[in-house]
Swiss-Prot record:
Primary role: A cholesterol-dependent toxin that causes cytolysis by forming pores in cholesterol containing host membranes. After binding to target membranes, the protein undergoes a major conformation change, leading to its insertion in the host membrane and formation of an oligomeric pore complex. Cholesterol is required for binding to host membranes, membrane insertion and pore formation; cholesterol binding is mediated by a Thr-Leu pair in the C-terminus. Can be reversibly inactivated by oxidation.
Subunit text: Homooligomeric pore complex of 35 to 50 subunits; when inserted in the host membrane.
Protein name, UniProt field: Pneumolysin
Residue ranges annotated as motif Conserved undecapeptide: 427-437
Topological type in the membrane: Multi-pass membrane protein
Motif Cholesterol binding location, chain numbering: 459-460
Organism this protein belongs to: Streptococcus pneumoniae serotype 4 (strain ATCC BAA-334 / TIGR4)
Phenotype of null mutants: No change in biofilm formation, about 35% decreased adherence to human lung pneumocytes. Complete loss of host cell hemolytic activity.
Length: 471
């Protein structure tokens, strides 16, 4: 066994993996109230609620384009820096490691390689040599489509996005320029989507004994001086996925509750019909993307535009070629002591803002009947008090109960906060035993963009029509 002393030192460590790999983000109290704002064309209700998000993952996203610490076989210290995806690399003399790559067509003798002293440069060089051989000998007959993965979330806070996409997402988030203030005020709805296009994965053989990864020159004292202990044990990067990833920001000022469904259709490439609510939402959506990988420059690209560029962005990196090289986009780690895959548990509280808009409407009355008519129209107007509780204020049309003759027309504007709309219309028959006859009576009418109630006919045969226009 290589380096028995170091081997015994690592095997003797006793620690709680779950405790070491758990990160608790923001903690907030649920002290939020509803509020309503009457705008010129609509009544907007803003509701904020405490939400919690937890993730358990062994697949860690890479958002830095040139991180020399993240290569297969790298030894990382388990501490706060690892939880923040800004790991501390243990740089000591290393023993050889065996690597494999999962590109199709490779003969068994070509699918693995050994690196004598693993480091970022030596591993990268060896992998690049193998990739060059694959492109030359196998790439022409083996068309490699990217393995597509995606995940999405409606953005409410940076802590929420870091739990979802990785602790170092803030770097990418800054490039996306996420306007959280507009989200919290209800002015915008924003969704973040992460597309991963995996070209190939480089893995290292499982470590049989912890001491096998070190040269004999490395001592227990060397590890102790670098802070390695049961409180700060070691993991090694067991695999790295290479490819291309795209972070999309979809931003709209629409207040519709169909926004998430419209974005889902966009992501899945569903054809959206014209003259639909989804089409209106997407036409009112701005797109910003941060692209990592798939470009010989090896840098991050930021592009902006409309939704019609989303499909092009995805198709652009859909296949692995020499012109579309892969960058590290995610990695997994295993504990050096026992090869158990490291699973990170992250959680946070955040404030979800839900906005519901109620358009103003009009109630049109048209009376052309050969009789005297009376109208009784009432409704409630919704508001919220300082505790966020609903307050319903009774309202009535100022011409209720008046005798109105033909031809009478009027339009009653109704604000978006109108609830419990009731309309009763009666006509004078002239009959002693039934002086007034009800022509129309409905309660709890929904507020629509335009409702026209027309009455006509004679005293004994009154007619009525209730026509709704709500496009």
């Amino acid at each position: 066994m290589a380096n028995k002393a170091v081997n015994d030192f690592i095997l003797a460590m006793n620690y709680d993996k779950k405790k070491l790999l758990t990160h608790q983000g923001e903690s907030i109290e649920n002290r939020f109230i509803k509020e309503g704002n009457q705008l010129p064309d609509e009544f907007v209700v803003i509701e904020r609620k405490k939400r919690s998000l937890s993730t358990n993952t062994s697949d860690i996203s890479v958002t830095a384009t040139n991180d020399s610490r993240l290569y297969p076989g790298a030894l990382l210290v388990v501490d706060e820096t690892l939880l923040e995806n800004n790991p501390t690399l243990l740089a000591v003399d290393r023993a050889p490691m065996t690597y494999s790559i999962d590109l199709p067509g490779l003969a068994s003798s070509d699918s693995f390689l050994q690196v004598e002293d693993p480091s970022n440069s030596s591993v990268r060089g060896a992998v690049n040599d193998l990739l060059a051989k694959w492109h030359q000998d196998y790439g022409q007959v083996n068309n490699v489509p990217a393995r597509m993965q995606y995940e999405k979330i409606t953005a409410h806070s940076m802590e929420q996005l870091k739990v979802k996409f990785g602790s170092d997402f803030e770097k990418t988030g800054n490039s996306l320029d996420i306007d959280f203030n507009s989200v919290h005020s209800g002015e915008k709805q924003i969704q973040i989507v992460n597309f991963k296009q995996i070209y190939y994965t480089v893995s290292v053989d499982a470590v049989k004994n912890p001491g096998d990864v070190f040269q004999d020159t490395v001592t227990v004292e060397d590890l102790k001086q670098r802070g390695i202990s049961a409180e700060r044990p070691l993991v090694y990067i067991s695999s790295v996925a290479y490819g291309r990833q795209v972070y999309l920001k979809l931003e709209t000022t629409s207040k519709s509750d169909e926004v998430e469904a419209a974005f889902e259709a966009l992501i899945k490439g569903v054809k959206v019909a014209p003259q639909t609510e989804w089409k209106q939402i997407l036409d009112n959506t701005e797109v910003k993307a941060v692209i990592l990988g798939g470009d010989p420059s090896s840098g991050a690209r930021v592009v902006t535009g409309k939704v019609d560029m989303v499909e092009d962005l995805i198709q652009e990196g859909s296949r692995f070629t020499a012109d579309h090289p892969g960058l590290p986009i995610s990695y997994t780690t295993s504990f050096l002591r026992d090869n158990v895959v490291a699973t990170f548990q992250n959680s946070t509280d955040y404030v979800e803002t839900k906005v519901t808009a109620y358009r103003n409407g009009d109630l049109l009355l048209d009376h052309s009947g050969a009789y005297v008519a009376q109208y009784y129209i009432t409704w409630n107007e919704l508001s919220y008090d300082h505790q966020g509780k609903e307050v319903l204020t009774p309202k009535a049309w100022d011409r209720n109960g008046q005798d109105l003759t033909a031809h009478f027309t009027t339009s009653i504007p109704l604000k978006g906060n109108v609830r419990n709309l009731s309309v009763k219309i009666r006509e004078c028959t002239g009959l002693a035993w039934e002086w007034w006859r009800t022509v129309y009576e409905k309660t709890d009418l929904p507020l629509v963009r335009k409702r026209t109630i027309s009455i006509w006919g004679t005293t004994l045969y009154p007619q009525v029509e209730d026509k709704v226009e709500n496009d």
